[in-house]
Amino acid sequence: MRRALALALLALLSGACSNEQQIPDETNAPAQRVVTFAPHLAEIVFAVGAGESLVGVSAWSDFPEAVRDLPLVGDAFTVDQEQLSLLQPDLVLVWQSGMPAHTVDELRARGFRVESVRTRSLGDIVAAMRRIGTLTGHNELAETAAGEFSQVLDTLRERHREAAPIDVFFQISSRPLYTVNREHFISEIIAICGGRNIFDDLEGFAPTVDIEAVLDRDPDVMLAGANVGDDAFMEWARWPDLAANRYNNKFLLPDETIGRPSPRLALAAQSVCFALEAARSNMRDAS
């Protein structure tokens, strides 16, 4: 299960490109039968008040609880054509950074209305909430949800505006060693909390790095999502002079929400800020 979640997260971070063109809905009628091909899209559908219109979801969709009982239509890379035909959706939401373009084209060729949703940045997530609200006829609820999400982030940003800068390494996976660049929503969250992503200058949404590069940049803090596992930082113990080791600043975030570009990232951002506050405290105590 943990390995599957890690693979799904890496797919999200890899930025596989799919076509953003949509088949127009000439009636402009709100969608009544929606399927989603990524767990975070199902979350957004519920967040904007359109949960009752959701009739099918992708593998690993587990939040909110209600999605666990819905039929599975595949994942970002495969489509259960038979199940999709049975469900007859009037809106198919796909993940722009995950589903391959040829799969999107095949869905459109079969006559399905497909909306390709971009969720690479925090701003993208807000836009996705509003767009899905419009498509499902829940504009007002979507605007409220988007506003609440933005307000949490704005509050955290203001709270940490004067915080002492702190160098952060975010570890997506251990083998291979993946991290995030400046364009990634995780890097945005680190910045909101007053941190500096040590690999913000790299190309690629989720670049691979080697151990030597991490040691050379000597982060004050190491963060990882729960999907990496309890042993996420075990290998780093070999270098006691690493700043994150000297300050005891290695934090495994409490759940997997940091890897999902959904409204629950507001909660994940609070966890990141809490970790960086604890890290600063550890550094003060050590000085």
Which residue ranges define each predicted feature?
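A ligand-binding cleft/hinge motif common to bilobed small-molecule-binding domains
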Residues: G98-A109, D216, V221-R238
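Extracytoplasmic substrate-binding proteins
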Residues: N19-R33, D90-L91, A101-Y178, F199-D201, ...
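Sec-dependent signal peptide recognition
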Residues: R2-L7
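C-terminal motif of bacterial Sec signal peptides marking the signal peptidase cleavage site
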Residues: L13-A16
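Short helices/loops that flank or line small-molecule/ion binding pockets
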Residues: Q81-Q88, R110, V209-D218
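His/Asp/Glu-enriched short active-site or ligand-binding loop at hydrolase and phosphoryl-transfer sites
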Residues: S58, E183-A206, A226, F251-L252
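A short, structured surface patch at a secondary-structure boundary
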Residues: R33-L87, L91-G98, H102-T103, I198, ...
